[in-house]
Amino acid sequence: MKKTGSFAEFHVNMIERVMVRPCLPSPKTILPLSAIDNMARAFSNVLLVYAANMDRVSADPAKVIREALSKVLVYYYPFAGRLRNKENGELEVECTGQGVLFLEAMADSDLSVLTDLDNYNPSFQQLIFSLPQDTDIEDLHLLIVQVTRFTCGGFVVGANVYGSACDAKGFGQFLQSMAEMARGEVKPSIEPIWNRELVKLEHCMPFRMSHLQIIHAPVIEEKFVQTSLVINFEIINHIRRRIMEERKESLSSFEIVAALVWLAKIKAFQIPHSENVKLLFAMDLRRSFNPPLPHGYYGNAFGIACAMDNVHDLLSGSLLRTIMIIKKSKFSLHKELNSKTVMSSSVVDVNTKFEDVVSISDWRHSIYYEVDFGWGDAMNVSTMLQQQEHEKSLPTYFSFLQSTKNMPDGIKMLMFMPPSKLKKFKIEIEAMIKKYVTKVCPSKL
């Protein structure tokens, strides 16, 4: 390991790269994808960090997880298949049993080099394997798993999954099942249910997550960076009490922090007052379908809520007003579900600029934190937003995560934005907090 600028550079040596197939014969069939599955045409990733366990010194995590993957694919055999295009342009899964790409690697450092994965380090890219951007969709691996061991005995599981196969909740279910296999269970505790025909949304718009170029995007010369900020629950609860003095309203921690993020981003980017801006966030709709989707359904079952308002009106209004706009967007999404659409036209307005859009994902209640391969629960869970060299513009993105043990108890915001805006964003969000409390949350900006 060596220090390069502000980064602790480390090297990962690839030991083996293999295809892992189901350990028992699996059905060879064609499976349909739902309308929502067809919209989610992009990879997403998760990083699970595990500390060394003195009770398992002789165990090889890569071997254990590789064998568990082979076992769990008996139940989740579609992951071992490949996508193919139908004549109408929709996708389906051909269950070929070709397998999941699995990589074993070894880092030349201990886990301390990761620093909770809060601030972007180019070396982190070695922890997740990504296919080339120009890979044909029918050649894509639906799932890629990499296990990287560190010199201290700890390890990182980096998984890259294609969105059409499952959503975050469904993938958490898969990882939990794989962990159960690693701990010696003979079958998953939750029976996986494919049944994509249960999601019948005839009026879904043909919008794909990877096609954000439909939004007008000015060229940004800066490479986006990833860093984090923690807002502790003491501050959130104080803000909640102060706001409720104005109006007796039930306010969630997500709504409060999302409102702070939205307003701070607008100010930091100095968006003109005449512009309309949007806050986008996904919501799990499994229990909102009529009838509700069955327990174990791991396909995409989310909708994109869209909070939208004029910059002048947002900045001249109160924090409560912004929160109520966010609450209204939640209600509107459920209303749209009843009318058989999960994405309104306002979400994909072609006149919206990237700089006017904020996207938030909330992982705080994800099952990712409980995935135990036999070394205990993950000590840290994170994601890595990967900007390709040719991408000159992206929406500002936030992931809400649980704070790690060395941080205050609160919401950890993983942020992805141009570096020139980070300092201003911190100033703005702290200024808003100071209106309600005198103690400002610790940050790592």
From Swiss-Prot:
Keywords: Acyltransferase, Taxol biosynthesis, Transferase
Pfam families for the chain: Transferase
Domain of life: Eukaryota
GO molecular function: phenylpropanoyltransferase activity
Protein name (database record): Baccatin III:3-amino-3-phenylpropanoyltransferase
Organism: Taxus cuspidata
Family, as annotated: Belongs to the plant acyltransferase family.
Any single biological process term in GO: paclitaxel biosynthetic process
Enzyme class (EC, first level): transferase
Described function: Acyltransferase involved in taxol biosynthesis. Catalyzes the selective 13-O-acylation of baccatin III with (3R)-3-amino-3-phenylpropanoyl-CoA as the acyl donor to form 3'-N-debenzoyl-2'-deoxytaxol.
pH dependence per the entry: Optimum pH is 6.8.
The enzyme's E.C. designation: 2.3.1.320
Swiss-Prot/TrEMBL catalytic activity: (3R)-3-amino-3-phenylpropanoyl-CoA + baccatin III = 3'-N-debenzoyl-2'-deoxytaxol + CoA
Segment forming the signal sequence: none
Functional pathway: Alkaloid biosynthesis; taxol biosynthesis
